[in-house]
Amino acid sequence: MPHSSHTQQTKTHEAAAGYSPRLCNDDLAPTRDQNWSWYNIFSFWMSDVHSMGGYVVAASFFTLGLASWQVLLCLLVGICIVQLCANLVAKPSQMAGVPYAVICRQAFGVFGANIPAVIRGLIAFAWYGIQTYLAANALMLVLLKFWPSLASLTSSSFLGLSPLGWLSFATMWLLQAMVFWHGMNAIKRFIDIAGPAVYVVMLALAGWIVYKTGLDGISFTLASKSLSAGEQTWQMITATALVVSYFSGPLLNFGDFSRYGKSMGEIRRGNRWGLPFNFLLFSVVTVVIVSGTQSLFGKMITDPIETVSRVGNDLAVAIGLLTMITATIGINIVANFVSPAFDFSNCAPQKISFRTGGMIAAVGSILLTPWNLFNSPELIHYTLDVLGAFIGPLFGILIADFYLIKRGRVSVDDLFDDTPQGKYWYRNGFNPKAIAALLPSVGLGLIISFIPTLHEVANFSWFIGVFLGATAYRWLARDEREVQAKAAFRSGAVAQ
């Protein structure tokens, strides 16, 4: 069971039998298996960073017209902000041993928590389908390279996908489902291997490129344009904000994983190695590879799949492509599968288990036909920007509630109490103050996202959302904060 001087905890795991069945099942109840070490958290972040999307994003920062030291400074500052936020959001879930959807009951109410849970689940749901499609494309490249005769299966189309495309998508879908179906321990073992495996391939690829081009063929400034001092300053601020925004999704539901941490010390150590150290190393290796492609192939290639496919040795190509596919499976599971599994389970615990919630997302990803979504960037923009406008305010409200209002305390039993006597019952299971803080904060985020003249400001929408959500909730819940402060004074407890 989780243990903390600030956690009013259940006596044993069997006490879950006394929890409301409308709020609890074996997957949502406080876990007894808090056995994740710093390395497991480190591997989680490796799986999140080491992806085709992460590769393209890391390379893009070096095309902004900034000097290499400026880019690295932006990456360092941005990822340190992510590290700080990860430490903050990890604590309540680690203390209580519950996932993100359950800890949200503190701020939104035992039923109101379904609002942030479903929002995060839908975001992950959409990205899960898109990432599976990208992995399927990589698999299709492998198949066509070694069996060119399969090209005949790409000539026709059904619902926007060729027969070979369907075969590849189904294969990736099943592989991910197999890992997920065996539970969190299988996921932990998978990401422990996936992250380091990508490093082996990337370092080998970087070494091959340096061998082919020589050190003179490597440049840490990939842009051809030059910027004024003012433009450089603005680009640096923007780049820093984009780093944080890139991690905003998995950051919000990091509690789904921190709940398994042995201690906050282990989690902080894992975050330190998995974020600043890992992200900077990955970015440097990425830019070595990308800049080398300019010298080696005559054009800059930002797609790792295309770069690997140009290596002369067939065995090396196969290993490289399969590792990239593994990396995509890794990020898809940790960022886009686990989240909806817990989030959808939270909506109807007795009807939807962790497995069922995950399979809802998996089946839904097929019905979404993500290849059609991916081929319509405007539709992706509008769909995900609308959902993304919620992420900043949700994070701000969650953090403000735990640290400023609840003063670092969690009443675990009350997270599963659906009676009016429960601390998190509020008004019929919903906290009107949290909802009132969320709606205008999201509304402003949507305005920023969809007004073209505010395009530059949109890069900071996560920060704006966090500030608005936290500030509005802090003000609306000021009476509760005073009550909590008096209770803490009477008990002699000091919030950390």
What are these regions (language model features)?
Residues 132, 136-145, 197-224, 246-247, ...:
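Hydrophobic alpha-helical segments and their helix-loop junctions in multi-pass secondary transporters
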Residues 18-108, 112-115, 125, 249-276, ...:
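Transmembrane helix-boundary motif of multi-pass solute transporters/channels
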Residues 394-475, 486-490:
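C-terminal membrane-solvent junction of multi-pass transporters and transport-like membrane proteins
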Residues 1-68, 202-206, 212-215, 227-240, ...:
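Membrane-interface "cap" regions at the ends of multi-pass membrane proteins
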Residues 38-54, 168-175, 206-213, 224-287, ...:
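Hydrophobic, membrane-embedded alpha-helices of multi-pass small-molecule transporters
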Residues 144-181, 196-205, 236-254, 277, ...:
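Transmembrane alpha-helical segments of multi-pass small-molecule transport proteins
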Residues 53, 77-85, 119-131, 196-211, ...:
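Selective recognition of specific alpha-helical transmembrane segments in multi-pass small-molecule
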Residues 119, 130-136, 167-209, 222, ...:
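Membrane-interface loop-to-helix entry segments
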